[in-house]
Amino acid sequence: MTKNINQPVAYPIFTFRWLAIHGLAIPTVFFLGGITAMQFIQR
């Protein structure tokens, strides 16, 4: 893994890992943002 740094063809990271991280991170950020917003709106 030391000499294959300059070869982006070996590991296309932006296929599964990008969809997995953004597919789970965006709903969780929206969910936590909704909870914190509701706590300020009620009172």
UniProtKB/Swiss-Prot annotation:
Record's keyword annotation contains Electron transport: yes
Q: How many cofactors are bound and how?
A: With its partner (PsbE) binds heme. PSII binds additional chlorophylls, carotenoids and specific lipids.
Which InterPro entries does the record associate with it?
PSII_cyt_b559_bsu, PSII_cyt_b559_CS, PSII_cyt_b559_N
Name the GO cellular-component terms.
chloroplast thylakoid membrane; photosystem II reaction center
Q: How is this protein positioned relative to the membrane?
A: Single-pass membrane protein
Name the keywords, alphabetized: Chloroplast, Electron transport, Heme, Iron, Membrane, Metal-binding, Photosynthesis, Photosystem II, Plastid, Thylakoid, Transmembrane, Transmembrane helix, Transport
Q: Which GO terms describe its molecular function?
A: electron transfer activity; heme binding; iron ion binding
Q: Where in the cell is it found?
A: Plastid, Chloroplast thylakoid membrane
Mind telling me which residue stretches traverse the membrane in this protein? 18-34
Query: So where does heme get bound?
Result: H22
Presence of keyword Plastid: yes
Q: Main localisation, per the record?
A: plastid
Which GO BP terms apply? Answer: photosynthetic electron transport chain
Q: Where is the signal peptide?
A: none
Q: Cofactor(s) for this protein?
A: heme b
Biological function:
This b-type cytochrome is tightly associated with the reaction center of photosystem II (PSII). PSII is a light-driven water:plastoquinone oxidoreductase that uses light energy to abstract electrons from H(2)O, generating O(2) and a proton gradient subsequently used for ATP formation. It consists of a core antenna complex that captures photons, and an electron transfer chain that converts photonic excitation into a charge separation.
Family of the protein in this entry: Belongs to the PsbE/PsbF family.
What binding partners and quaternary form does the record give?
Heterodimer of an alpha subunit and a beta subunit. PSII is composed of 1 copy each of membrane proteins PsbA, PsbB, PsbC, PsbD, PsbE, PsbF, PsbH, PsbI, PsbJ, PsbK, PsbL, PsbM, PsbT, PsbX, PsbY, PsbZ, Psb30/Ycf12, at least 3 peripheral proteins of the oxygen-evolving complex and a large number of cofactors. It forms dimeric complexes.
**Protein name in the entry:** Cytochrome b559 subunit beta
Organism field: Trieres chinensis (Marine centric diatom)
Which gene codes for it?
psbF
